[in-house]
Amino acid sequence: MTLEDGDAETIPEFIISSKDFKEGGEIPKNCGYKHGNKQPQIQLQFNPSISAAAFALIMDDPDAMGAVGKVWVHWLSYRRNDAPYPINFVQPGNMIEGKTDFGEIGYGGPAPPDKRHTYVFKAYALEVDLGDLKEGYSKQELEDAMEGLILAEAKLTGTYAP
């Protein structure tokens, strides 16, 4: 549903979706770290009553805990609310990205070492711009910067097998 589809009263408060996979569905193979590492198209839609100054996205793999002993961070992205609605996390040049657990800045696709894993995409609408956030930030730095500033959050999950 988009703003064009109805009035503000009928728009969900804050949702995250992907054009590449449905909630709980299979993330495309070419989005995998070793199979093209293509960013999935992630989109945020929100009710205009949320006057967010910025948005953040965290993609991680809680299933990695059993394989590597930690929740693996695959993507950290932050962007100001300076683009047309809906907000997309695939437009280069308007995002500040953090460092993944692969040691790289930007998107690092699924790479489960053992079995099918579930990946969690968490989106946050933020009250203010996190102007001090610099490229290469960690998940902890992003979470610390967002503390007390989250207006709304949404979650999308997808699976990927080796």
Task: Set out the residue ranges of the language-model regions.
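N-terminus-centered regions that define maturation/targeting leaders and the start
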Residues: 1-162
